[in-house]
Amino acid sequence: MSTPIELPKWADVSLVPILAVVVAFLVAGLVVLGIGENPVKATVLLIQGALGSGEGIGYTLYYATNFIFTGLAVAIAFHAGLFNIGGEGQATMGGLGAALICLRLDFLPWYIVLPLAILSAMAMGALWAFIPGYLQVKRGSHVVITTIMFNFLAATLVVYLLVNVIGKPGSMSPETRVFAASAHLPYLHEALAYFGIKIPKSPLNLCFVLALIASAFVWVLVWHTKLGYAIRTVGHSPTAATYAGISIGRITLITMAISGALAGMLAVNEILGVQGRLLLEFSSGYGFIGIAVALMGRAHPVGIVLASILFGILYQGGTELSFEMPRVTRDMIVAISGLVILFAGALDGLIRRPVAGVFARLLKSGA
C-alpha cells in the first residue's frame, strides 16, 4: 500500500476548503438550472445581496458573528478530542442567563448591567456544557449523546419559564418584556456615529468586535499557553497525555466549560444586540452550522472567521435571492448550505485525495 501524501499546511487550510466550496456551488448550480433558473445570475444576485451594499454587508457580518461564536465553541472542543454539538442548548441557556440579569437589573447603568449580562450568558452556557463533560468524566456518558439531550432540555426549560414564570404578562407570544435601553448592546452604526463615522443601519452590533476578540483569545489559548498545549495533547493522544501527567478529566471539564461559554455568547449578539428580549428559537440553527464552520476553518480561529463570513453571505445573499428569484426558495438556500457542509465535512476526502495526488505527481516530477 502506498504511503498517503501529507498536504502542505497552506493547501490543507486554504486550498481544500476553497475547492470544496467551489464544488458545492457547482452542484448547487445544477440544482438551480434544473428548476429553470440561470445559475450564473443566481450567483451574482446572491453575492450582490450579501456584499453589494453597506446594509447587506452589515447583515452578512451580523450572521457571521453568530457563526464565529458557535464555530469557536466546536473548534476548541475538537482540539481536546471532544465533539460538542450542544451549541444550540448552550446558546439558549446563555440567552436565559442574560435575560435574567436584564429583567432584574436593567434599572442599573449600562456599564454595570451589560457586563453582568454578558458574564451571565457565558456562565450559563459554560454550565450547560460542563454538565455533559462531567457526566463523561465521572459516568462514562458520551458527550455527543448528552449534548444532544441537553439541547432539548434547554429548549423545554426556556419554553416553560417563558410561559409560566418570566414571560410578558398578557402577551400571546412566549417572550419576556423588552429590556431597558441600558441593557441593549449598541449597534455598530450607532457606535461609529459617535466618532463621526457613518455606515448604513443594520443589526450588526458591537458583539462582532467581541467575536473577533474571542477568536484572538482562542488562538492565544490553544497555541500559546500551557493549558492549550494540554488541550491539544489530550486531543492528539490521550495515552501520551496520561504519561505526561495531564489529567484528561480536568482538561475535559475545562474545555467543555470554555466551549459552552463561547456558545453562550451567541445569545449576547441576538438577545442583547438585536432582539432586546428573550424569545423562543432565537438561535435558529446557528449551533449546528457552527460544526460546519469549525470543519471548514480547520478548527483555527482565522479559518473560522472566514468560514463564518461565507455562511453569512449564504444567509444574507440567500434572503435577497429568494426575493429576486421566487423559485429559488429559502429552503433551497438551506440545501445549498447543506451542500457546502457536505463537501467541506463528510466528503472532504473526495477533494483531499485528488489534491494530494496532484502534489504527489509534482513531488515525483521535481525529484
Listing of model-derived features with the role each one plays in the protein:
Residues 191-277, 301-302, 306:
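Helix-loop-helix "hairpin" substructures at the membrane interface of multi-pass membrane proteins
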Residues 2-70, 111-112, 116, 198-201:
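Membrane-interfacial amphipathic/re-entrant helices at transmembrane-helix boundaries
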Residues 54, 147, 151-224, 277, ...:
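Transmembrane helix-bundle core of multi-pass membrane transporters
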Residues 17-33, 70-74, 95, 99-101, ...:
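Hydrophobic core segments of alpha-helical transmembrane domains in multi-pass membrane transport
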Residues 4-15, 78-87, 109-183, 221-226, ...:
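Short loop segments and helix-boundary regions at transmembrane helix junctions
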